[in-house]
């Protein structure tokens, strides 16, 4: 049987081969998700699978992914994994891993794992995966730790497997240090399996096409993607465009500032002027910051090209050492998403005057809200699981924001039924909040109200990570702000980044923020206002007072 065409200069051949690589990453994604033990990996999809070339550059990424992983895995491979373990120090069956936040994704629960792929005795590529483990020891995932040493166990780049044999001492140390050893070990095994799938399928792909390595294909993919990104940048006017965003922070407000500097076919983002690092777990490390800088700009420049190294090269960023977006190595950062998730909105705001038709309003899912529920079951065994609560997406030039969406995280929510199996709670309410979306020509997505009741006989400790309680999500292009968030226990306000203890029968109620609007509310069509009224997404009062609507209003909307 003749070999398939391998002309990398032929766009059709290149696209077919490229899609095959993405499918390989998707196969591994499916394996990891289907075999993972913990809800945060299995249900929330808080993981990624990536194929890297022999230099550690991103070649193909699974279709469904967390944006932070766009740059994290290839940067970790190129800057840390490969220098410590070059190809001549690796053998088939080796698996490398670390959870060092300076190397991976900025916080300890994320484990970065890389497996060399051999063909004819030579390393031709690497399979990479990152997954958010359900526990890593230390303080439960929230915002109160004052340094990284309180947040859990940290292990450097190690050989988790050597020539296919597990390093049992390392596994023993990890399992002895966490609250959920079975789930943690199971998730690590799932990552190993996913990487093995990528390795096996890539070798089959190379054999099918008669290739010895991926070098030529990688060069074609990277150069095409980089050229496409640079072409899109050249369509924007040169200049420096600035913005700032005010956040709740932990106990004092945090200011994020950015200057987006466009010069010919490259973009540089400078975060000078951003608030200093803090003695709480909301510091955002360089790798996490850069990932969101790239993601935001890719959304505006070239959202269709699949993620790979070429998309990254034209974009750089920087932040002063010691600020909350470039903290010292010892600082805490387990809840770094409370800061990092806002970076895309900050960049959109800076570019509002450059590409108003492409930016969207600030999102209530930025950052994602999380409740880490920990305690003892009635039989004395321990449980622990994280539930996410999403706010409304910001509105866009052509569409309303989506309700309760986790932009920019792209995380799913653990199904209520699965969460109630993992944790002794009853979800009494889960509903959209009318009028929570920021008004505009296009309305911001709605936030939600969720009520959880402790059904267990023992107290439940809930560690909260939330934002936008004092500073709601802003609109763009004259759009209005969405509603702010709330956290309550039995009707009494709670500290949104603290620990809430629920005794038997007590309730936690959260109201997530609504997304910001796009365009002036006076420009919203009557048809859309009437549709919102009919679906109880806005009230009659809002229709009259905010949108200036004077048409008929059904009784249900009064």
Language-model-detected regions and their locations in the chain:
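Active-site Gly/Thr loop motif
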Residues: 96
């Amino acid at each position: 049987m003749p070999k398939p065409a391998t002309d990398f200069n032929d766009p059709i051949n290149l696209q077919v081969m490229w899609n095959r690589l993405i499918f390989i990453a998707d196969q591994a994604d499916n394996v990891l998700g289907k075999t993972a033990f913990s809800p945060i990996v299995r249900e929330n999809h808080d993981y990624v699978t990536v194929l890297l070339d022999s230099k550690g550059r991103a070649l193909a990424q699974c279709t469904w992914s967390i944006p932070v992983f766009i740059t994290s895995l290839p940067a970790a491979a190129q800057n840390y994994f490969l220098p410590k373990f070059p190809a001549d120090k690796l053998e088939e069956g080796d698996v490398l891993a670390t959870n060092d936040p300076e190397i991976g994704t900025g916080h300890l629960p994320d484990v970065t794992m890389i497996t060399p792929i051999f063909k004819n005795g030579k390393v031709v590529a690497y399979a990479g995966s990152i997954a958010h483990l359900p526990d890593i020891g230390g303080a439960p995932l929230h915002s109160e730790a004052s340094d990284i040493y309180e947040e859990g166990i940290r292990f450097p780049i190690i050989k988790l497997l050597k020539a296919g044999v597990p390093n049992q001492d390392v596994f023993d140390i990890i399992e002895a240090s966490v609250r959920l050893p079975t789930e943690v070990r199971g998730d690590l095994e799932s990552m190993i399996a996913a990487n093995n799938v990528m390795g096996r399928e890539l070798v089959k792909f190379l054999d099918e096409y008669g290739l010895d390595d991926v070098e030529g294909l990688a060069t074609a993919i990277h150069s095409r993607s980089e050229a496409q990104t640079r072409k899109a940048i050249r369509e924007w006017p040169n200049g420096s465009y600035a913005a700032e965003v005010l956040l709740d922070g932990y106990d004092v407000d945090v200011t994020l500032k950015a200057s987006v500097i466009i010069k010919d076919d490259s973009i540089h983002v400078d975060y000078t002027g951003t608030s200093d690092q803090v003695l709480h777990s909301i510091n955002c490390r360089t790798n996490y910051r850069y990932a969101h800088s790239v993601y935001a700009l890719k959304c505006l420049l070239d959202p269709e090209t699949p993620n790979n190294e070429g998309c990254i090269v034209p974009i750089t960023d920087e932040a002063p050492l010691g600020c909350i977006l470039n903290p010292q190595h010892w600082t805490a950062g387990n809840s770094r998403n409370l800061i990092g998730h806002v970076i895309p909105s900050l960049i959109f705001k800076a570019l509002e005057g450059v590409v108003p038709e492409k930016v969207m309003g600030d999102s209530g899912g930025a950052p994602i809200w999380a409740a880490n529920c920990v305690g003892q079951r009635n039989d004395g065994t321990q449980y622990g699981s994280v539930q996410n609560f999403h706010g409304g997406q910001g509105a866009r030039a052509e569409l309303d924001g989506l309700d309760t969406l986790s932009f920019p995280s792209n995380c799913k929510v653990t199904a209520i039924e699965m969460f109630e199996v993992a944790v002794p709670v009853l979800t009494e309410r889960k509903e959209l909040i009318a009028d929570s979306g920021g008004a505009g020509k296009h309305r911001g997505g709605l936030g939600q109200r969720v009520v959880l009741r402790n059904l267990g006989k023992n107290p439940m400790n809930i560690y909260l990570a939330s934002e936008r309680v004092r500073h709601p999500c802003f609109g763009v292009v004259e759009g209005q702000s969405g509603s702010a968030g709330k956290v309550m226990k039995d009707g009494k306000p709670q500290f949104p980044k603290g620990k809430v203890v629920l005794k038997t029968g007590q309730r936690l109620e959260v109201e997530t923020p609504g997304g910001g609007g796009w365009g002036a509310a006076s420009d919203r069509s009557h048809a859309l206002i009437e549709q919102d009224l009919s679906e109880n997404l806005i009230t009659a009062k809002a229709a009259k007072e905010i949108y200036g609507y004077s048409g008929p209003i059904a009784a249900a909307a009064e």
